[in-house]
């Protein structure tokens, strides 16, 4: 059986990267929450 996780850096950035987070209101709220928490890395 094929494994479900097939890593790809391009796909990772497209779905979870900083630009994609900034493009939606919900994504911006995620970044704000991570800033508030003091995360070193905000996104992939």
From Swiss-Prot:
It holds the Pfam family Ribosomal_L34. GO terms for molecular function: structural constituent of ribosome. Residues 1-44 are annotated as: Disordered. Keywords: Ribonucleoprotein, Ribosomal protein. Transmembrane segments: none annotated. GO terms for cellular component: ribonucleoprotein complex; ribosome. GO terms for biological process: translation. NCBIfam families: rpmH_bact. PANTHER family: LARGE RIBOSOMAL SUBUNIT PROTEIN BL34M, MITOCHONDRIAL RIBOSOMAL PROTEIN 34 FAMILY MEMBER. Belongs to the bacterial ribosomal protein bL34 family. This is Large ribosomal subunit protein bL34. It comes from Cutibacterium acnes (strain DSM 16379 / KPA171202). The gene is rpmH.
